């Protein structure tokens, strides 16, 4: 209720879920001193997003849907008031805007979060990718000296940095647009402001759970993360 369940055009589904608010990432080695609080005090891995209101309006060429939610985690002591606006056009395009306001409802509030952004699930068949942003390899806010702004091509699997111990990886900073799928059949996303991008064939939960790369369970969709902010590597 109050979530985008599917986005398809010409009979083909491109998105099967999302966007939804997200503050969690699979922990990295340098998160070892924060992990206990993140997981067992602030419960960032257990999000809850409650729909508060929905309004929609039909026009000649589009439908506009406005959704208000409250995003938090299990303890409900902190969270975000979220305003989603979807403009869905008859030509097969969709514009999405999300505004969030931080809210404290109790005494427990994390000093900082690993990420603030949205997550979406896309069609598994969309494995090719192109983006305009930092590349070609991964980059983070405190680790991007070797990255250069440009247009890059890859595959979803190749976006992964294969660490010996599975952890958060493959992030690209300052992305202005990206495409998954090829030029004739794909999903093109353009951002008003530069955002952080992760594309993966696995969820953060499966990455967190795995002890070795071969134990990472593949997802049934391409997982898309778009981050307003993503914490550094430390």
Q: What do these predicted regions represent?
A:
Residues 1-234:
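Beta-strand/loop-rich accessory regions of lumenal/periplasmic or secreted enzymes
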